[in-house]
């Protein structure tokens, strides 16, 4: 009994002593990656490749402005809307209050992944450019047809885009009963 207790106590001391002694590290970055050295460790550096990737989207709302509706907008949805195995990108958008007062609006944007590190804006072709004060969004298959649908939470009425399975979407907000003008954040 004493021998078992001693063994258990020794094992616990060993475990506690070695807890957190090692730090898991991933593989080193490829030779072409930008890196810096910090305390002898290689740290990868991020490079902005937005333009090279073909993404020309600009979020127009102004979070530093005085109206709360401006500070709560913005969202990014990753989805494979055409089920080709590559993630596509949907950006939500909202105008500033000043833009809205002048009758201007802001649309979200859907970018198709070209499988080569670039993207193509397919917003108009896909039919997902309805302007709104977007607060965020979600992706899901609301009708269980196997295709990802897009739900955008908006101040002034949410938008539900049904994926038609052919690269296009249909706005079914009213039919689905989600176009309530109550402010909803996502």
Annotated model-derived regions:
Residues 1, 18-186:
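Acidic, glycine/proline-rich Ca2+-coordinating loop motifs
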Residues 6-18:
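Bacterial N-terminal signal peptides
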